[in-house]
Design a protein with these regions (language model features):
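Alpha-to-beta junction loops
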Residues: 7-18, 31-33, 111, 181-190
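Short, solvent-exposed loop/beta-turn-alpha elements that line the ligand-binding surface or hinge
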Residues: 36-49, 91, 131-153, 200-201, ...
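Conserved N-terminal structural module of periplasmic/extracytoplasmic solute-binding proteins
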Residues: 1-29, 40-47, 61, 170, ...
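Short helix-initiation/N-cap motifs at beta->coil->alpha
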Residues: 1-2, 21, 93-99, 166-181
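Hinge/lid segment of periplasmic solute-binding proteins
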Residues: 20-72, 83, 96-99, 207-212
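Glycine-centered hinge/linker elements that transmit conformational signals in sensory
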Residues: 102-103, 138-170, 211
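A ligand-binding cleft/hinge motif common to bilobed small-molecule-binding domains
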Residues: 23-27, 192-205
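Extracytoplasmic/periplasmic substrate-recognition and gating elements
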Residues: 160, 199-265
Length: 266
């Protein structure tokens, strides 16, 4: 709201932290500077950045936002608990395998499974069939959502899975209260940029795998997601200096060490 008020008053700061959901809105209102000129001149070095990453912040072939890093959905797990249960996790489980392995882990250790009942898992399910969740919803198709909520119901009813009441109490959206932190669950779901924070807070060795897929998947649902963007305000009187900062933020090992990769992998 504060940024919107600043935009309306023509008082945007030189550099704006931008998100996918607002990029087109700000670009269409003429409030974002064209970054392509700084990329072409070499002020912002993109030689080691994939074209697809540049494209993620571009509209109609012009770059208006520079990705600060890339993330991927992940499942993180407690290595010691998994080893105690005598199970091995592949690089990517199916949801059915997650359920079965969760039962084994609960029987052997008493530690419960967490199933992501939110929109991220629903998006993954849609992607397993080569679709996208919001395209399905716009078309009135319910395939992904029906499959997802059937899975949510299955896990909610399982003794081996954390109950909805306890999950709400733990609040997995906050690192410090995630149920894996105190050993209530053996697994958790997040994005890869959160791994260091989760592992440090847990204070023990955690493994990482891809988000689960479905047993009938026709395509790999995993994807890279820009963590956040930086844009330069069109009203900025210091565009080149701002572009130099974006270059440092994106390419500097020093900067990434300071942030501990919190914004994603450069």
């Amino acid at each position: 709201d504060k940024l919107s008020a600043m935009a309306a008053g023509g008082n945007l700061p030189d550099i704006i932290q931008m998100d996918y959901s607002y990029l087109q809105q700000y670009q269409q209102s003429g409030q974002l500077a064209d970054l392509s000129q700084f990329i072409d001149s070499g002020v912002i070095d993109t030689s080691k950045i994939a074209d697809s990453v540049i494209d993620s912040g571009s509209i109609d072939g012009t770059c208006y936002a520079l990705s600060l890093g890339s993330n991927a959905p992940m499942m993180v797990y407690d290595k010691e608990i998994v080893e105690q249960a005598g199970v091995e996790l592949p690089e990517q489980l199916t949801i059915e395998e997650l359920y079965d392995i969760g039962q084994t882990i609960y029987e052997k250790t008493g530690v419960k499974t967490y199933y992501d009942g939110g929109i991220n898992m629903m998006q993954i399910i849609a992607r397993t069939q080569g679709s996208h969740l919001f395209d399905e919803l716009a078309a009135g198709t319910k395939t992904a959502s029906e499959t997802h909520f059937a899975n949510v119901d299955k896990f909610n009813k399982a003794e081996s899975a954390i109950s909805p009441d306890l999950l709400a109490e733990k609040n997995p959206d906050v690192v410090e209260t995630k149920p894996i932190i105190d050993g209530t669950t053996w697994n958790d779901f997040s994005y890869s940029n959160q791994y260091i924070s989760i592992a440090n807070t847990a204070g023990r060795d955690l493994g990482i795998t891809m988000y689960p897929t479905t047993s009938d998947a026709t395509t790999q649902p995993m994807f890279l997601k820009p963590s956040q963007f930086f844009s330069i305000a069109e009203t900025s009187q210091n565009k080149e200096e701002a572009a130099k900062f974006l270059d440092w933020f994106t390419n500097s090992v020093e900067c990434n060490n300071i942030l501990l990769a919190e914004r994603g992998i450069p």
